[in-house]
UniProtKB/Swiss-Prot annotation:
Keyword Transmembrane listed: no
Record's subunit section: Homotrimer.
The protein, known as: 2,3,4,5-tetrahydropyridine-2,6-dicarboxylate N-succinyltransferase
Residues bound to substrate: 104, 141
Single GO cellular component term: cytoplasm
Involved pathway(s): Amino-acid biosynthesis; L-lysine biosynthesis via DAP pathway; LL-2,6-diaminopimelate from (S)-tetrahydrodipicolinate (succinylase route): step 1/3
CDD domains named among the record's database cross-references: LbH_THP_succinylT (cd03350)
Organism of provenance: Sodalis glossinidius (strain morsitans)
Upper classification of the organism: Bacteria, Pseudomonadati, Pseudomonadota, Gammaproteobacteria, Enterobacterales
GO molecular function: 2,3,4,5-tetrahydropyridine-2,6-dicarboxylate N-succinyltransferase activity; nucleotidyltransferase activity
């Protein structure tokens, strides 16, 4: 693994000069190995180690290099065609392969090669980009988007039109992470490496980036870039110091534990916020 990482790091330093025509065999093989490992879930761009999320930047570099070494090619897609550098994950799959992998894909859902989809996941007509990791028993609902290298936990529901941001550019950014047992409401957007911690419920139409204030109304505390575990979050506003205007924020209206969440439906949690 160390030699593979070194090959990627070395090639990335020379990326501006690399083209599909001149890429050397060592670099091509290293990039292809990484993409295959991301595709199978053997490697992932970020993982939780000792309670903290760690981003493996070299894997993101490999994903970026994959665009340097590939020409656009014709991609068949049912009644239409596409033209891109990255093949589709399910190209060439037959019924037996889908049954073996153990998840459902509803047309016209699109998943790029290099994204991992775990068992018992349901992909409605949605989009999952390269480098993403979608864990077991998750629902990616209609028109939801899982961006490049985003990490989605177990038993997550990404509602219709929800967007989970990708982070290949800028490279130093960490991936957006949705931990286990979270609910992301319709048309909400979590971007710029935001972490939504385990068991949180995000209401419809909530937008959170690194600069978004996440206001806990019970404590008055303001968080940035992280939704604490078990939070129920809605969109809101905070007044300016002089009271002349207000600016958008996300508001933590309550905290719930796993026991409460198991007994109470998501809709009820969001309706009883007063």
């Amino acid at each position: 693994m160390q030699s593979l990482q070194q090959n990627i790091e070395t090639a990335f330093e020379q990326r501006a000069a690399i083209t599909p025509a001149n890429v050397d065999a060592t670099t091509r093989d290293a990039v292809n190995q990484v993409i295959a490992a991301l595709d199978s879930g053997t490697l992932r761009v970020a993982e939780k180690i000792n309670g903290e999320w760690v981003t493996h930047q070299w894997l993101k570099k490999a994903v970026l290099l994959s665009f340097r070494i590939a020409d656009n090619q014709l991609i068949e897609g049912g009644e239409t065609r596409f033209f891109d550098k990255v093949p589709m994950k399910f190209a060439g799959w037959d019924s037996e392969r889908f049954q073996r992998e153990g998840f459902r894909v509803v047309p016209p859902a699109s998943v790029r090669q290099g994204a991992y989809i775990a068992r018992n996941t349901v992909l409605m007509p949605s989009y999952v980009n390269i480098g993403a990791y979608v864990d077991e028993s998750t629902m990616v609902d209609t028109w939801a988007t899982v961006g490049s290298c985003a990490q989605i936990g177990k038993n997550v529901h990404l509602s219709g039109g929800a967007g989970i941001g990708g982070v290949l550019e800028p490279l130093q950014a960490n991936p957006t992470i949705i931990e286990d047992n979270c609910f992301i409401g319709a048309r909400s957007e979590m971007v710029e490496g935001v972490i939504v911690e385990e068991g949180s419920v995000i209401s419809m139409g909530v937008f959170i980036g690194q600069s978004t204030k996440i206001y806990d109304r019970e404590t008055g505390e303001v968080h940035y870039g992280r939704v604490p575990a078990g939070s129920v979050v809605v969109s809101g506003n905070l007044p300016s110091k002089d009271g002349r205007y207000s600016l958008y924020c996300a508001v933590i209206v309550k905290k719930v534990d796993a026991k409460t969440r198991g007994k109470v439906g998501i809709n009820e949690l969001l309706r009883t916020i007063d």
